[in-house]
């Protein structure tokens, strides 16, 4: 039988010792969280996402004023309530996407901010307002989300009266944000519109009182 050299014996011992080790293998490194990159501006987000979602709510509850009087429009079927829920869930989930840093408008779009007494703010003016008080921007977003959560709740309960009130809360949250960051110069026109609507729309009257 051939002799086993000292070097060979040491090598074999090392292999056996390694294979018998009771140590646990190192856990694989956790995958890095994906970086969320906004695709569109705030203005486009509103046009293609937030506004269409809110329309599911606003279109579901209305007061139709005619020469014959005022009639209520409200959800009557499961399908009607399903549409309200779709809008509310979309709003509640997607509104937080406005917290991601993104352009205020598409490239080259300056809103209606030129000429004498422009009704809308430019992207630079909006950014200046945000930089001055970023907490306020987050508060406006939270108000919108809370209104959406309220609508989700009344949709589950099939609460018609609650839906009229919740839609008024959503409308107020939207206008409060727009008057702060989009068209503060139109505040008088908006308030006049609210007064006119309140003449026939009890939910609008309730909204005006809460301001």
PLM regions and their residue ranges:
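Sequence context surrounding c-type heme c attachment/ligation sites in exported
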Residues: 25-85, 89-211
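Bacterial N-terminal signal peptides that target proteins for export
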Residues: 1-10
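C-terminal motif of bacterial Sec signal peptides marking the signal peptidase cleavage site
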Residues: 16-19
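Secretory/periplasmic and organellar redox-cofactor proteins
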Residues: 6, 21-23, 35
